[in-house]
Curated annotation (Swiss-Prot):
Residues 60-83, 166-202 are annotated as: Disordered. It comes from Caenorhabditis elegans. This is Homeobox protein ceh-13. Residues 183-194 have a biased composition (Polar residues). Residues 63-81 have a biased composition (Low complexity). GO terms for molecular function: DNA-binding transcription factor activity; DNA-binding transcription factor activity, RNA polymerase II-specific; sequence-specific DNA binding. The keyword RNA-binding does not apply. It is found in: Nucleus. GO terms for biological process: cell-cell adhesion; embryo development ending in birth or egg hatching. Residues 114-173 bind DNA. InterPro entries: HD, HD_metazoa, Homeobox_CS, Homeodomain-like_sf, HXA1/B1/D1. Keywords: Developmental protein, DNA-binding, Homeobox, Nucleus. One of its GO terms (cellular component) is nucleus.
Amino acid sequence: MSSTECYGAPPHNYYQDWPTTHSYYPSVPSSYSPLNHHPADIWAAHPSNYIMGNGHVSPPATASGLSPPASRSSNSSAELPTGVTASQHNTYKWMHTKRSQRPAAPKKKVIDENGTNRTNFTTHQLTELEKEFHTAKYVNRTRRTEIASNLKLQEAQVKIWFQNRRMKEKKREKEKAFLARNTWESNSPTSSCSGEDVKNFK
C-alpha cells in the first residue's frame, strides 16, 4: 500500500492556485544549445522572465553564480578618472616611493682659536705665495691684485697672508736669536780667580 492510499491523495483543486513549473523558467526555443548561447544573450532576448518581486529586472546568473558584466570596456572607462590610463589606475599609493632630495652640505669654515675665519689654501697657492714672500716681504697693492688674480684669491686674503707670514718670520728670528745666545753663554768660561790663586800666582 502506498502513502497516497493510506493518507489519501489531496484533491486536484488543491493545486490549482499554485503556478505551473513552466512560469519559473524562461521560454527557450527548440534550437537552444548551451554551447553557443550566453546567459546574457538569453536575458536580452527574454528580460520579462526575470522580473523580481520588487519590479526590477534581474539578469541571469552565470556558471560561477555571478551576474555577467554589461560591458568590460564601458565599465573600465567609467571607473577610470579623466586623465588616468589603465596602467596608472592599477598602481597603489604604497607602491609610490617618495625620495626627498638632500641638500648639498655647506662647506665648513675653519675657525681659528681667536674666533676668526681661516682660509684653507691649496698646495699650489701656498707655494706661489712663499716664492713671492722670499722675493719681497712687502708687496704693494698692484702686486697684491696680480697675485690674487693669478691664484684665484681675494686681495684681502693675500694681504692677510703676507701679514701673518711676516709675523711668523719675526717669531722664528727671535727664537733663533734666543737659542744662539744660550748656546754662546753655555760655551763661554765662567770660572773666576779667587784671592788665594792670585797670591800663589804671584
